[in-house]
Amino acid sequence: MSTPIVKSMKVVPVAGYDSMLMTLSGAHAPFFTRNIVILEDNAGHQGIGEIHGGDYTCEALRACESLVVGQPVGKYRGILDSIHKHTKRAKEDDGEGIQTLDISKLKFVVKAEWAIECALLDLLGQALGLQMCDLLGDGKQRDKVETLGYLFYVSDKEKAKELNYLDESDSSDTWFRMRRKEMLTPDAIVSQAQCLHEKYGFRNFKLKGGVLAGSEEMKAVCALKQAFPNGRINIDPNGAWSLAEAIDLCKPLENVLTYIEDPCGPEAGYSSREIMAEFKNAVKLPVATNMIATDWRQFYHSAALKSVDIVLADPHFWGFGGSIRIAQLLNDWGLTWGSHSNNHFDITLAAFAQVGAAAPGKPTALDTHWIWQDGQNLLDDAPRIVDGYLEVPEKPGLGVTLNMNKLEEANKLYNKLPSHDRNDAMAMQYLIPNWKFDSKKPCLVR
C-alpha cells in the first residue's frame, strides 16, 4: 500500500498574548511567539505541528521544505533522517543548552524539525485511519492524560503600562480575570490554585520558583499543601538554589513535596548533574528535570550519576518518537516520564495529549501552559482539560482542525511585534532598573 505524497509545506509564524509571569529568567513579555507547520498531501489531508517561536526557528523550518515536499508520508522517518543529515549546528550553539536557564539558548534545545514530525504523523494517521498515539511506541495506553495546574507568580502589569499587557478585567471568566493580575504572596498562589481547580479540576500543582527567596516560595508550597492535603505539590526553581540551600529548604518538606524539579545547578566546578546527584543523596525526594537531560547524551550522564528520577521529556526537545523512546526506557528502568511545557497554542496541547496517551507505565502529571493562553485558540476543536485530565482527540492523526482565520489573526499579531524572540529581561527593567539575569539569584532578589 502506498501512502499519500506531501505536495506543499507552509510555515506560519504566530503570536499570542501572555501575562507578566515570573521565572528565574525574568518576566514574560506581553506576547509569546510560535511557529506553525502546515503540510498538505495529494489525498486532500492537512497535517499540522507547532514549535518554538522566533526567526531562527522559522528560517530553520523553511530551509527543510525541499526535503519534505514530494516525499511519501509513510517514509516520515526517512524524511526526518534526511533533515538531520542536512542540518548544521549553529555557530552560536555552544552545546550548553538550558542547564543554567539562559533563555537565549532555548532555540538550540528545541529542534525545529519536530514540528514537521508532528505534521507528518498527523498526515500518516489520517491516511491509515489511526490516532497519532497509535503510531508512537507501543500504541495508545490511555484515553485521557493527567495534567497539573502550573502555578506562577505574576507581577503587576501596571508597572509596565507602556508594554500593553492584555487586560481581561471585563471577562466573564473568573480565571481569565485573575491570570492578568498581580499574584506574589502565598495567599495569592493558593487562590490561583483554587481557581484552577474549579475551572479545570486540577488536583496536582507545580509552582514555578526562582522568583522570590527560597524560604518565601516554600511558604507558598506549604500553604498549597494545607489547601490541598491530598494533592501532589511540586516546585521548580530552575536551579536557582545552591546545593546547601536546596537541602535546607527541601529536607523539612519531604512529606509535603511530591518531587522537586531542578533544585540546584552547577557550582564550585561541579556540573548540574553532579550537584543534583549529591542533592539526591541528601534528601529523600524524587528529583525531576527539564534542564540537565534534554537529549540522549545529557541523559546518559544523568543516568550514570543517578541525578534524576523523573525526566520531563518535552517532545519539542526530544521529538515525538524520541519522547516515547525515553518514556519506554524510563519505564523499564523503574523511573518516571513526564513532559515540560513552554507557552503554547492548542496545536501543542493536542500533541501533548497524543504523546501522553502513548507513554507507557505511570507518567507523572504533565505540565501545560495552556491555562495561561486558554481562549486564544487556533483550532476549531481544541482538546479540553476536564477533572484534571487532558482529553485525547479521537479523530485520526492529531485529531484536530486548524482554523485558518484564527491562524491569520495570530500571524498578523506576530508581524506587528518589534521583536520575535523571547526576552524575559526586557519587562524586568520596569520592576528593577538595570536588571540582569543571574542563574543563581531569584529574579526578584537583587
Which residue stretches match the model-derived regions?
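Conserved, mostly hydrophobic/aromatic
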Residues: 6, 44, 116, 129, ...
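Flexible C-terminal active-site loop/helix
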Residues: 4-7, 12-16, 305, 326-329, ...
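Catalytic domains of carbohydrate-active enzymes, especially glycoside hydrolases
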Residues: 192-205
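Glycine-rich, aromatic-flanked loop segments that form ligand/cofactor-binding clefts
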Residues: 107, 118-166
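Short, Gly/Pro- and small/polar-rich lid/capping loops
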Residues: 1-35
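Metal- or metallocofactor-binding catalytic centers and their adjacent structured scaffolds
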Residues: 40-127, 435, 439-446
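Active-site mouth loops of central-metabolism enzymes
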Residues: 145-190, 209-210, 237-242, 288, ...
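Catalytic core of soluble alpha/beta enzymes
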Residues: 207-348
